[in-house]
Amino acid sequence: MILVTGGAGFIGSNLVAGLEESGAGPLVVCDRNGVGDDGRTIAKRQLEACIEPEALFPFLDTHRAEMQAVFHLGAISSTMETDASLFARNNYRLSLDLWRWCADANVRFIYASSAATYGDGAMGFDDDGSKAALAALRPLNLYG
C-alpha cells in the first residue's frame, strides 16, 4: 500500500496517476480536497481509500503492516494564509509526526519540499544544507 498526502493537488494527482499507470499500489490519498471540484483530479483513479487528514494516523495504525511507502506532498500552500500556528500544526508538526511514524514502522518516507523556501531567488537556488546556507534563505511568506 502506498499513501500520497496531498494526492488531490496538482503534483500529487499526477504522482497518483503515474503510480497507478506503473502498477504500484494499492493507492491511498490523504487530502482535504478529495471531494467536490478539487476531487476531480483523482476521481478517475482506482484508489483503495481517500481519507481526510484527521483520519491519517488511525488509518496508518490500522494498515501498518501493509504500508510500503508514504509520499508526503500535503501542506497548506496558500501564500495568503497568515496564521503561523496553523502552518506550524499542519505543515511542520504533521510532517514531523508522519516522518516519525514512518521511521518507527520502517516505511519509506518520500518528502517533497517547495521552491518557496528560496524566496524571490535573489540569493540563488542551492540545496546546500549547511547552517549558513539555511540561515541565508529568505522565504516570502509562511509557506516558504
Regions found by a protein language model. Name each.
Residues T5, C30, V70-G74, F109-A115:
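SDR active-site strand-loop-helix element
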Residues S13-L15, D38-G39, E81-T82, D120-A122:
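Short glycine-/acidic-enriched loop or helix-start segments at secondary-structure transitions
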Residues V29-L56:
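Glycine-rich phosphate-binding loop and adjoining beta1-alpha1-beta2 segment
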Residues I2-A24:
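N-terminal Rossmann NAD(P)H-binding glycine-rich loop of SDR-like oxidoreductase domains
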Residues K44, P53-N90, W101, G119:
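NAD(P)H-binding glycine-rich loop region in Rossmannoid oxidoreductase-like domains
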Residues R89, R93-D97, D104, R108, ...:
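Catalytic helix-loop patch of NAD(P)-dependent Rossmann-fold dehydrogenases
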